[in-house]
Each structure stands twice: as C-alpha cells, then as structure tokens.
C-alpha cells in the first residue's frame, strides 16, 4: 500500500495523482534527457534524493539488516523518490524509504517462492 492511501480510493483519484507525479518528473528531468525517476544515474540520485539525518539513519539500518548492495540502495532511493512524488512531497521521508524497502523485500520473497 502506498503511504497515505485509503482502501477503496477511486481509480480516477489515483490516476490523477500518477499523472501529476509523471508531470513533476518530466519537469525535474527536462534538461537531463530522461523522463522518470527510474532512469536516474548516480549524479541525479545525489541531486534529487538527498536524505536528512533521520532518513540516513533509516537507510543505514536497512543496509545493515537487509545487506543491501549499492544497486539495491539506488533502487530503494528511486522508489522512495517516486512515492514522495505521488504524495507531492518535496522531500523523501523515512516512511517512504521503509515502504520502498518493503517492496524490495516482497520482490525477493516472490523470487524465492516462485522463482
């Protein structure tokens, strides 16, 4: 579940939120030759996914507990940035990082279970 979502939220509302997030990303990357957070390279990650102290602590905990690789770390940041965009939040928040990490865990579980 995405942060702040209520069960039964109308699909039109979700579609509008996604459209706004995509427009925000298009504007963000207008000079970079990309369109989405998923396409960010390391330079753009550093620019657009800055973490405050609380978020850094959450990421350190996730790295130590989940044994994240640099690639997995980058993916979590990209997903957290996307969650922030869907929430129209300028900043990545700790709950967005935890949510993004939970998707990573679910991916691993699915691969192990159904792989």
Question: Which residues does each PLM region occupy?
Answer:
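Basic, amphipathic alpha-helical bundle interface domains used for macromolecular binding and assembly
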Residues: 1-113
